[in-house]
From Swiss-Prot:
Keywords: Endoplasmic reticulum, ER-Golgi transport, Membrane, Protein transport, Receptor, Transmembrane, Transmembrane helix, Transport. The chain crosses the membrane at residues 3-21, 36-53, 62-82, 99-112, 120-139, 152-170, 182-202. One of its GO terms (cellular component) is Golgi apparatus. It comes from Arabidopsis thaliana. Required for the retention of luminal endoplasmic reticulum proteins. Determines the specificity of the luminal ER protein retention system. Also required for normal vesicular traffic through the Golgi. This receptor recognizes H-D-E-L. This is ER lumen protein-retaining receptor A. Residues 1-2, 54-61, 113-119, 171-181 are lumenal. InterPro entries: ER_ret_rcpt.
Length: 215
């Protein structure tokens, strides 16, 4: 494992910890898209089908468990916690994510590296992760104002994907037969979706003003 992948994993982990901190410390999920969190839970559940069959390393197994458990915990809190669920912005979180799931599953069936159950679901999870942030970005755009923790959560998610792109470039030039083209293309799409948010986040940071997204 190279430094770029490790840094990407840590950025991803930090984003999850920030979101958990926001939910548990404030007992609020205002500004957070439940639909995005459900998509991420589905991403991890389908990507890590090999958790109990293919052992790579202790680090790898721990990270898989952490991301599965944390994504399910976040969804549970937003749906079931008596205090947290009251703050859910249901009226703003209206992105029709079921169509995204269907489209990504069809893509997984058609475009995969090997037509097996595990590889089809792996491809599906990669495609789905690329667009899972869409409901969150739409919700933030509709609400206008973005609180500090939510903004940092999205920034670290974007940093995670950006670092993974550097990781793939590094592996392409240093490893023989590196052909994860599905992950590379999907990663570029995912990073592009963050571009607008990063621009306004930078402007907010530079001017020391509250982050606001145009409607």
């Amino acid at each position: 494992m190279n430094i770029f992948r490790f840094a990407g994993d840590m950025s991803h982990l930090i984003s999850v910890l920030i979101l958990l901190l926001k939910i548990y410390a404030t007992k609020s999920c205002a500004g957070i898209s439940l639909k995005t969190q459900e998509l991420y839970a589905l991403v991890f559940l389908t990507r890590y089908l090999d958790l109990f069959t293919d052992y790579v390393s202790l680090y790898n197994s721990i990270m898989k468990i952490v991301f599965i458990a944390s994504s399910l915990a976040i969804v549970w809190c937003m749906r079931r916690h008596p205090l947290v669920r009251r703050s859910y912005d249901k009226d703003l979180d209206t992105f029709r994510h079921q169509y995204v799931v269907l489209a990504c599953f069809v893509l997984g069936l058609i475009l995969n590296e090997k037509f097996t159950v595990q590889e089809v679901f792996w491809a599906f999870s990669i495609y789905l992760e690329a667009v899972a942030i869409l409901p969150q970005l739409v919700l933030l755009q509709r609400s206008g104002n973005v609180d500090n923790l939510t903004g940092q959560y999205v920034v670290f998610l974007g940093a995670y994907r950006g670092l993974y792109i550097i990781n793939w470039i590094y592996r392409y030039f240093t490893e023989d037969h590196f052909t994860r083209w599905i992950a590379c293309v999907s990663g570029l799409v995912q990073t592009a979706l963050y571009a607008d948010f990063f621009y306004y986040y930078y402007i907010s940071w530079k001017t020391n003003t509250k982050l606001k997204l145009p409607a």
